[in-house]
Design a protein with these regions (language model features):
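Hydrophobic/small residue at the entry helix of a nucleotide-binding pocket
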Residues: 39, 76-77
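Adenosine-nucleotide cofactor-binding segment
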Residues: 64-65, 71, 82-159
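C-terminal hydrophobic helical "lid"/dimerization subdomain
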Residues: 51, 115, 132-138, 145, ...
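Helix-to-beta-strand junctions that scaffold the AdoMet/dcAdoMet cofactor pocket
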Residues: 167-169
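Rossmann-fold NAD(P)-binding glycine/threonine-rich loop
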Residues: 157-161, 165, 177-197, 211
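Glycine-centered, small-residue-biased loops immediately flanking beta-strands
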Residues: 93, 171-172
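Residues in the short beta-alpha loop(s) of Rossmann-like NAD(P)-binding domains
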Residues: 99-103, 179, 259
Length: 307
């Protein structure tokens, strides 16, 4: 609801279904990222495993202290999944993140460091799978028994195929990335389904409870969604930016619908600008680790020209 609108009308269903949620976060832009975070939270919540061997009673969520593989997780949703795996209520012992573009992997490694993961009891490994012939064999070096939870972040048949092979006993594969092709399919090993209790989950967005959990995670700064806010812009540049969105690098673009401002990378403000407020904005961003922040947003709203 909202999009590029400057004002909106809530439908009666929103109120009747209890879907108007209270948000007391530090900034508007973090609130705008509740929905994408809820998709990740929902995916993690949808995972399930046996309570004990041969039990038909399931424990919902990722396997605590287990091994997780996030395949193709070098986009904004993958970044949120890394953050949530490290800082969420249930943590794995081992977290392997893959991608095929080294630049994106390097960005992930800067934002979500091995050291930060270690502080939270998680062994974090980044792997570029571009030139790896047998991905299953290579990634099992980090979890010999296989992976308890595997998340697929790209609708790629090959990735699904080796992702299925990576599952441990009672392993759960989540097909997170929605395909455009209605006939998208991949080979499935039914031997492992029968004898090793492997299973599959597909989630498409989060529900109201996932949204509530996401709000709490953002308000408490447990998950730092600012790490995926790479650009800001005003409403005057929203149309053109939307048209070329697939061609743009970076993650989420934050539109301030009452402001006039060109599409700008958060860490690329010009310190030599003639506008004093641009120079001050750069200073604020640098103080916050080159990330957009509540402080930067408040200064921007106060000083950027109105549409």
């Amino acid at each position: 609801m909202g999009g590029d609108a400057t004002t909106i009308i809530f439908s009666d269903q929103v109120m009747e279904n209890g879907s108007l949620l209270k948000y007391n976060g530090d900034s508007f832009f973090e609130g705008s990222l509740v929905e994408p975070l809820s998709c990740v939270v929902g995916a993690f919540n949808a995972q399930y495993h046996m309570k004990k061997m041969y039990s038909y009673e399931h424990v919902m969520g990722i396997k605590e202290g287990g091994a997780i593989a996030l395949l193709g997780a070098t986009g904004p949703m993958g970044f949120l999944a890394i953050d949530f795996a490290i800082h969420g209520p249930k943590k794995p012992k081992t977290l392997v993140v893959t991608g095929r573009t080294q630049k994106k992997i390097d960005m992930a490694a800067r934002l979500y460091t091995v050291e930060e993961a270690k502080k939270n009891g998680v062994k974090l490994v980044y792997v570029n799978t571009r030139d790896i012939v047998d991905v299953n064999k290579e990634l099992r070096k980090y979890s010999e028994k296989g992976f308890d939870d595997v998340f697929i972040f790209a609708p790629n048949e090959e990735m699904v195929t080796y992702g299925v092979k990576m599952l441990a006993f009672d392993g759960c594969l989540n097909f997170f990335s929605g395909p455009a092709d209605q006939e998208f399919s991949s080979r499935v090993n039914f031997y492992n389904i029968h004898y090793n209790s492997t299973h599959f989950v597909g989630t498409s967005g989060g529900n109201t409870e996932d949204m509530k959990q996401s709000i709490e995670l953002i308000e408490s700064k447990t998950v730092n969604v600012a790490k995926i806010a790479t650009h800001i812009l005003g409403l005057d540049h929203a149309v053109e930016t939307t048209k070329v969105l697939p061609e743009l690098e970076g993650s989420k673009k934050i539109v301030y619908t009452h402001k006039k401002f060109p599409l700008t990378e958060v860490d690329k403000f010009d310190e030599n600008s003639d506008d004093k407020y641009i120079r001050e904005l750069k200073s604020i961003v640098e103080r916050n680790g080159n990330l957009w922040s509540g402080e930067a947003e408040r200064y921007f709203i106060q000083n950027a020209p109105e549409i």
